[in-house]
């Protein structure tokens, strides 16, 4: 994995919040995913499923980083250029795995 400048603890907190808010997927994109970030660059996340709005609030308030987050909801209509960027450079941080109960 390339250097994205985010501590493992913060990634773990993002995953825990994704599970808490029943998200299907969390994708890191932007300068951190590309590896050309600056020390104070924000953390760009694209999310789908669940309660994306509350995830966006909690990720700002409950993670142990001073970095800012920019969260976009993939379930809403987004500009095609932004979607292409997410698909091209995105790194999946979390994806819900479905369990079959027989």
What role is predicted for each listed range?
Residues 1-25, 33-39, 48-102:
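Catalytic core of pol beta-like nucleotidyltransferases
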């Amino acid at each position: 994995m390339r250097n994205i400048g985010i501590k493992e603890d913060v990634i773990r907190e993002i995953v825990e919040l994704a599970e808490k808010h029943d998200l299907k997927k969390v994708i890191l994109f932007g300068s951190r995913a590309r590896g050309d970030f600056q020390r104070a660059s924000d953390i760009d996340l694209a999310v789908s499923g669940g309660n994306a709005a509350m995830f966006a609030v909690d990720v700002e308030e409950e993670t142990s980083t001073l970095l800012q987050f920019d969260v976009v909801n993939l379930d809403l209509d987004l500009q095609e250029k932004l979607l292409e960027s997410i698909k091209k450079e995105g790194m999946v941080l979390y994806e819900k795995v479905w369990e079959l109960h027989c």
